[in-house]
Curated annotation (Swiss-Prot):
Subunit-structure text: Heterooctamer of four alpha and four beta subunits.
Pfam families: Asp_decarbox (PF02261)
Main localization category: cytoplasm
Protein name: Aspartate 1-decarboxylase
Gene Ontology annotations of biological process type: alanine biosynthetic process; pantothenate biosynthetic process
Reactions catalysed: L-aspartate + H(+) = beta-alanine + CO2
Record text on cofactor binding: Binds 1 pyruvoyl group covalently per subunit.
Organism encoding this protein: Rhodopirellula baltica (strain DSM 10527 / NCIMB 13988 / SH1)
Active-site residues, record numbering mapped to chain: S29, Y62
Enzyme Commission number(s) from the entry: 4.1.1.11
Family assignment from sequence similarity: Belongs to the PanD family.
């Protein structure tokens, strides 16, 4: 039997969700609207990396499904010490991808507005004022805005 090498790759990302609540007394996790979990193809109880854009903190927890149409993104348990209401966060889930598939692997990337409504599904912004072109092999200049309407930063 031959061991298949795997790479840990980004599987899904919810970009710039707005935190609506934090409850240090809850047992743990991050509450996410079910509509966003489905759009991102993230399962309840799946491991989540949470990157707090506002505070610069990072943590790992798991997703739990919030109430339908609630738009609530809530930090629960110990995470509530690092994430506060009003913070913008990026939620990321990873998967082990066979080495043979790594070069063509495409994660599911969703972008939300300040009300945690799905804005669009699309390509990763490659860097300030850059984006991947249609075949993802070249970088081209972009005048795009961030999902919340802010201009992309100049330079790196």
């Amino acid at each position: 039997m031959v061991d298949t090498p795997y790479r840990k790759m980004l599987a899904a990302k919810i970009h710039r969700a707005t935190v609506t609540g934090a409850d240090v007394n809850y047992e743990g996790s991050l509450t996410v609207p079910p509509e966003l979990l489905v759009a991102a193809k993230i399962h309840p109880y799946e491991s989540l990396h949470v990157w707090n854009v506002t505070r610069g903190t990072r943590l790992e927890t798991y997703a739990i499904e919030g109430l339908p149409n609630s738009n609530d993104v809530c930090a629960n348990g110990a995470a509530a010490h690092l994430i506060r209401p009003g913070d913008h966060v990026i939620l990321a889930a990873y998967a082990m991808v066979p080495e043979a598939d790594a070069a063509t692997h495409k994660p599911r990337l969703i972008f939300v507005d300040d009300n945690n409504q799905l804005s669009h599904v699309g390509p990763e912004i490659a860097g300030p004022n850059l984006r991947s072109d249609s075949d993802d092999t070249h970088l081209v200049r972009s005048t795009e805005m961030t999902p919340d309407g802010q201009p992309l930063a100049e330079g790196c």
